[in-house]
Amino acid sequence: MGRAREIGEGNSSSLREQRNLREKDRRMRMKHLFSILSSHVSPTRKLPVPHLIDQATSYMIQLKENVNYLKEKKRTLLQGELGNLYEGSFLLPKLSIRSRDSTIEMNLIMDLNMKRVMLHELVSIFEEEGAQVMSANLQNLNDRTTYTIIAQAIISRIGIDPSRIEERVRKIIYGYIYFEA
C-alpha cells in the first residue's frame, strides 16, 4: 500500500510539472505575440496589455475601413475608365519599347487632354542612356498624341538597356498624370 501511494504521488507530481511547463510555454508564447503586436501598433512607447489590445483593435478596424474605401475607389475608377473609353474621351498612355541589336524604338500614345510630355525630355532620356537619336516624331491626330523615337547605341558593344529607358519614360509620363495601377 505504501508503494502504491509513492507511485500515485509520482504521477501527480509529473502531471503538475507538465501543467507548469505547458503554462510556462503558453505565457512565453503570449508574451512573444504581445511584443509583436506592440511593435506593429505603437513602436514609440510601451503600453499595458489592455491598452495595447484596444489600440490594435481600433487600428485593425481603421485598416479594414481603408481597404473597403480603396476597393470602392478602384471600382468607381474602373467603371469611369471603361465609360470614358467607350465615349472615346479618355485614353490611358500606351508605351511600347522594342530593341533589336543596337537599335531601340519607342512608341508612346497619349490622350490629347492630358498634359503634354515634351519631346525633348524623351530625347534627353535616350541620350543620357548612351543612345544617339536617329529619328524623333510627334504627331497630333484627333484626340491623341503619338511620340515615336528611334535611336541607336553610341557604342554598339555596350548597347542600350530598354528596361531602364522604359522606367525613366514611365516616370515622366506618370509625373504628369495621375494613374493608379
Swiss-Prot record:
Keyword Lipid metabolism included in the entry's annotation: no
InterPro entries hit by this protein: bHLH_dom (IPR011598), HLH_DNA-bd_sf (IPR036638), MASH1/Ascl1a-like (IPR015660)
Record GO terms (molecular function): DNA binding; DNA-binding transcription factor activity; protein dimerization activity
CC annotations in GO: cytoplasm; nucleus
An annotated GO BP: regulation of DNA-templated transcription
SUPFAM superfamilies per UniProt: HLH, helix-loop-helix DNA-binding domain
Domain bHLH: 14-63
Protein location: Nucleus
Spans annotated as Disordered: 1-22
Family: Belongs to the bHLH protein family.
Name of the molecule in the record: Transcription factor bHLH167
UniProt organism field: Arabidopsis thaliana
Taxonomy of the source species: Eukaryota, Viridiplantae, Streptophyta, Embryophyta, Tracheophyta
